[in-house]
């Protein structure tokens, strides 16, 4: 498990903000944690052909979007051509966080043939990223993501970019992450410290694996070292040992 510690997302009602690695005053350890995550993924890419990733979690508010954006930025810093895709078609937020404008075309518009992929892509020059918003919320997101057009779009993105990161809804809420996970090379599972019960996390990981998704590993967010030493009945007090798909892609959760 990769640990992103001692940094909590600021909230203002429903208007959450991202904690970017480029923000002024960002702790050194926070930035280095993403570099460590990048190093591990680079190692996997060399032996497992990992270039497309879906980022998900058990429940909302586990900082998965924060992880998706910062991982994309960290990958781009190393000279890679990176695309960040907002696949939360129900409640898209990345376009607001990344200031890509309102009512922008995106995934849903591409899949419904309202525009081409190139027309929907946004260049974020300050972040050295290419961003694909979620687009207009459709009435049937899961069905739309299950269409052959989605697989075709993923394949096109894979050809255009070195790394493609998909930010997907939580596993316990909808099936979208599992659907997307079948199209990509692997999934990164985000676990917020002292938040989702361990049984729920186990169940979410198992659901992904049962659906044929290769879970590469997990990222622990909002970790409090002092609190962890006192013990907890929640997920962060467990050690998640993923075999990086070298064995049978099983997640061993041990106390």
Residue locations for each model-derived region?
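P-loop NTP-binding module
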Residues: 1-255
